[in-house]
Structure formats: structure tokens, C-alpha cells
């Protein structure tokens, strides 16, 4: 005689799964929005606060090589803030020259990247759809190689018996090798080469979003191609130009590897000064003060870019 088994009943979800599903239903949107803020706090705000704390300390022969800001002794809390690290930056002209040269090199390099990157982005945007992805790949492909290896490759190209000088001697353009390596010119070449893709991609994105009926209307109304370019196309791609300029200018200010390997003793950029203070002099408080001032200088273009983005969003809806 067969026995009838009771129908299998579905088990209620476990306590943790039930709690997780309820949390997702109630606060899922807030959690998704909170993730980037947590990322920014952990990787940007927290390191900034640590560097700022070190900048207010004093140098010490210890590990780590700085004093603590707060000490508890004899039942009392003593707080020691040292502003002398920031005052030292104003006393020594080396730091001012390093800031000034870093801003100058970054600005000129950004302008050169724009002159090279805009035609490249234009060529990619107006190429056939079948070849567009290949051209984009060629723009991005060098970035897949180690940055250090690419800079070392430029050392081989620019040195006195390198590829460039040998080629110019073979053509008969020059009679003796040109001194390019370990000069400011080599620094400009290295930075422009390294950061051109960061200029090309935002401009390319802006170019493919243009409504070219506006360009045709300008030409139909009698505007010449050059005037149409500067009065119609350039304003429509202004967002891409500004975004690309920020992507080039901001990292170029603090560049260390390129000035160290391609530059000479006159290439005094803030990245080299930071390395000197941190690792050679082991003066972490002064190095932290140098880094804080550099970050404050970079906040100005970042805020300007943010203001422009908000203005663009307001104009377009």
C-alpha cells in the first residue's frame, strides 16, 4: 500500500537574505548613490587629510620621519601645529620657480596637445565607419604599453646618437647631432606624446555629437569654411576641448617621470621637488606642504571646469 507524501512546501527565505532584500527595497537607491562618495572619501579625502596632517608636523629622525600633532602626557593633551613648513615655501625661491615652471610646462603642453589632438579627432570622427574603430584603437594602443617603457623609448630616439639625429644626419639636414635629450624641449615632447590621447577622445566624442545641419546652414548662408569652423564647430565642441585640456593640464603639472628621465637640471618641476623632499631629504612635512599647495592650485581649473559643465547643462535643458 503506497503512502502519500505531503506536498513539498517552499522554505521561507533565510534571515540574512530576507534582511538584504528588504534593505535593497528600502535603501537600494541611496546605497548606489553612496558608493561613489565612499570611493572618493577613502581614496581622495582621507589621503588628503593625512598629507595635510603631516604638513603641520615637524621633521624628526624617526620612522615615520615626523612628529605627532597630538600627544597625551601627564594627563594633558598637547597639540603642536607647525606652520613653518608653509612659510619655508615662501622663503626659498626654488619652490616658487618649480610651481611656475610646472604651470608653464603644463599650459604649453596642453596647447600643443590641442593643436595636434583636434585634427586627429577630426580625422577619426570624419573617417568611414569601417575604419573609425581601427583609428581609435591606434590612438589608444600606445597606452597599453608601460608608461615607463615608452619614456625610455623616447630617450633612445632623442639622444645624440639616437634615431632622430641619425635620420637627420642621413638626410643631410644637420651636420652634427642636435642636443635634445635632457632639455626642456624633450620634456615638452614627452608630455605631448604621453597625453595626446587624453585630448583626442573627448574632442572626438564632441565631434560625433554635432548636428551637422547647422554647419550646412552656415555654408548655405554664405559663411566660408574657415569662419564656419570657428563660429559653429568650435563652440559646439567647446565642452570636449575643455575636458581634454583638464585631462592633460592637471596630471602634467605634477609630472615626475618625464622631467626626471628626459629633462635636464633646468627642468625644475614640482614633481621632482616632491621626490627630492620625500625620498632624498626625507623631509615629509615640507614635502606634504608642497603637495598641499599644488593641490590648491589645481582646484582653480577644476572649479572652473565644474562651473562650465553646470552652465552647459543649464543651457541644454
Curated annotation (Swiss-Prot):
InterPro entries given in the database record: MetI-like, MetI-like_sf
Subcellular location: Cell inner membrane
Record has Cell membrane as a keyword: yes
Keywords: Cell inner membrane, Cell membrane, Membrane, Transmembrane, Transmembrane helix, Transport
Periplasmic topology ranges: 52-104, 154-184, 260-284
GO biological process terms, semicolon-separated: putrescine transport; transmembrane transport
Protein family: Belongs to the binding-protein-dependent transport system permease family. CysTW subfamily.
The protein's role, per its UniProt record: Part of the ABC transporter complex PotFGHI involved in putrescine uptake. Responsible for the translocation of the substrate across the membrane. Imports putrescine for maintenance of the optimal concentration of polyamines necessary for cell growth in the presence of glucose.
Record-given protein name: Putrescine transport system permease protein PotH
Amino acid at each position: 500500500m503506497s503512502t502519500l507524501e505531503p506536498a513539498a512546501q517552499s522554505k521561507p527565505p533565510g534571515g540574512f537574505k530576507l534582511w538584504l532584500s528588504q534593505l535593497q527595497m528600502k535603501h537600494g537607491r541611496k546605497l548606489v548613490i553612496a558608493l561613489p562618495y565612499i570611493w572618493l572619501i577613502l581614496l581622495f579625502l582621507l589621503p588628503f587629510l593625512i598629507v595635510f596632517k603631516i604638513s603641520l608636523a615637524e621633521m624628526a629622525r624617526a620612522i615615520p620621519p615626523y612628529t605627532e600633532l597630538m600627544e597625551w602626557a601627564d594627563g594633558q593633551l598637547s597639540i603642536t601645529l607647525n606652520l613653518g613648513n608653509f612659510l619655508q615655501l615662501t622663503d626659498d625661491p626654488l619652490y616658487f620657480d618649480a610651481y611656475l615652471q610646472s604651470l608653464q610646462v603644463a599650459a604649453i603642453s596642453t596647447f600643443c596637445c590641442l593643436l595636434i589632438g583636434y585634427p586627429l579627432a577630426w580625422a577619426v570622427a570624419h573617417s568611414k565607419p569601417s575604419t573609425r574603430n581601427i583609428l581609435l584603437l591606434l590612438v589608444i594602443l600606445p597606452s597599453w604599453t608601460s608608461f615607463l617603457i615608452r619614456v625610455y623609448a623616447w630617450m633612445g630616439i632623442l639622444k645624440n646618437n639616437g634615431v632622430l639625429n641619425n635620420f637627420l644626419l642621413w638626410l643631410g639636414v644637420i651636420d652634427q647631432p642636435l642636443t635634445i635629450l635632457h632639455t626642456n624641449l624633450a620634456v615638452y615632447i614627452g608630455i605631448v606624446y604621453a597625453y595626446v590621447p587624453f585630448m583626442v577622445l573627448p574632442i572626438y566624442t564632441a565631434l560625433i555629437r554635432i548636428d551637422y545641419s547647422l554647419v550646412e546652414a552656415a555654408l548655405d548662408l554664405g559663411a566660408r569654411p574657415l569662419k564656419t569652423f570657428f563660429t559653429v564647430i568650435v563652440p559646439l565642441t567647446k565642452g570636449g576641448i575643455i575636458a581634454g585640456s583638464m585631462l592633460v593640464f592637471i596630471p602634467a603639472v605634477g609630472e615626475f617621470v618625464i622631467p626626471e628621465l628626459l629633462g635636464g637640471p633646468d627642468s625644475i618641476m614640482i614633481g621632482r621637488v616632491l621626490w627630492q623632499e620625500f625620498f632624498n631629504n626625507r623631509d615629509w612635512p615640507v614635502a606634504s606642504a608642497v603637495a598641499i599647495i599644488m593641490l590648491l592650485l589645481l582646484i582653480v581649473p577644476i572649479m572652473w571646469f565644474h562651473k562650465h559643465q553646470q552652465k552647459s547643462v543649464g543651457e541644454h535643458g
